[in-house]
Amino acid sequence: PLPQYYDLLKPVAPTTAYAMQGYRAHADQYYVLDENKAQVGGYMGEGISCPDVSDEFAMLHDGLVGVSTGHDHRNGFVGNVDGTMLIATPTCGFDTYGPAPDHRATRLIEFDIRHPYEPRTQLLTFGELIGKPSSKKAYTYAINAKPPQDGEGDDLLRRPSLWSRLFGLFGGHGR
């Protein structure tokens, strides 16, 4: 994210409910979303991890409607800084840290020709789209989209044939 994401936050005491400690130059302060700057329904699950100094916002500002980031895996909010929409989206993957599985999300951004510079946006969470994550290996494999480890993923999506089972017992891996 850009340092300007901190402009959407309000400094608070460390004991404030849902307060998150900042990073780097902001590490001595705790923050919550500023309800006057961030859209309703947003949340912070960790501090904003960004460079201390960056000219990127100034370079991008005039040519963009908004900036969408996903580096901070536990944050999901939208706000506006100097006419530019700043969007934070939590991780949608399962191979990294992040929010609880049913809160992992992707973000839908809708542009309407009647007001093209004011897109609508919403989080589409795993819990809302799919339901509770399963612990079945085949399902987890499909979500992670990673090659399975040894012994994981062998004939998980279809029942193995008799030949495949015999081959696995007497001379192979069962694949």
How would you label these PLM feature ranges?
Residues 1-72:
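His/acidic metal-ligating clusters that form di-metal
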Residues 33, 39-61, 75-158:
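Binuclear metal-dependent phosphoesterase catalytic core
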Residues 151-175:
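Composition-driven, intrinsically disordered low-complexity tracts enriched in small residues
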